[in-house]
Design a protein with these regions (language model features):
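Membrane-helix boundary/juxtamembrane motif in polytopic membrane proteins
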Residues: 25-26, 84-99, 121-126, 153
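Solvent-exposed interhelical
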Residues: 64-106
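Small-residue-rich segments of transmembrane alpha-helices in multi-pass membrane proteins
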Residues: 28-44, 90-96, 156-169
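Helix-coil boundary and interhelical linker segments in multi-pass alpha-helical membrane proteins
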Residues: 1, 39-59, 113-126, 170-174
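Functional transmembrane core segments of multi-pass inner-membrane proteins
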Residues: 28-72, 77
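Intramembrane alpha-helical segments
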Residues: 1-44, 141
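Transmembrane helix-loop-helix
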Residues: 1-17, 100-152
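Hydrophobic transmembrane helix bundles of membrane-integrated enzymes that assemble
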Residues: 59-67, 103-115, 165
């Protein structure tokens, strides 16, 4: 599994090197997919049958990573447009990107909420608390993009969001 993921990342790097400015192909979605698979890969490889709770976990990671990447594209819209980079925002527009982010946030909250109906696992509570915190921080970055654009704070905060699960693991399991 790891070799397949590594090969897909290698193909991505070759692809963006040769085609990056020519055509938009959805790199944000691909990167979010690779991120979510990479996080879950050790568990996927370890177990025979993937339980529904792991699928919920993966979908939530994918949505959060997608929000993060499209949010960065939206904030960097003018710079990317000027430099000729293709991104979701430069192809679809900053306003459309904002709408997609809001739809993804709404979908995340629906999936997050429904997990409490379908899963009774106590361990789920810790992860769900971190996930809703991550989504809340990303929503805050979206709402304060003008202020956070200065000194690129949006990027620092947006990247730190993905460190929160590690902090949670250290605190709870450490």
């Amino acid at each position: 599994y790891g070799l397949a993921l590594g090969f897909s990342v290698f193909c991505y790097l070759v692809f963006i090197h040769f085609i990056r400015k020519k055509v938009y192909w959805g790199k944000e979605w691909f990167i979010a997919l690779v991120y979510a698979v990479g996080i879950c890969l050790p568990t996927f490889a370890y177990i025979q049958n993937i339980p529904p709770i792991l699928i919920y976990f993966w979908v939530q990671l994918f949505i959060l990573a997608s929000i993060n990447l499209i949010l960065f594209n939206m904030i960097e819209y003018k710079i990317d447009k000027k430099m000729g980079f293709n991104s979701f925002a430069t192809v679809k527009g900053a306003d459309f990107s904002r709408k997609v982010i809001l739809i993804l946030l709404f979908a995340f909250v629906l999936i997050w909420s429904s997990s409490f109906l379908f899963f009774k696992a106590e361990e789920l509570l810790d992860y769900q608390a971190i996930f809703i915190l991550m989504a809340s921080v990303l929503a805050m970055v979206l709402s304060k993009e003008v202020v956070l654009r200065q000194e690129e704070w949006y990027r620092v905060i947006g990247d730190i969001v993905f460190v929160l699960p590690i902090i949670e693991i250290i605190i709870i399991d450490g």
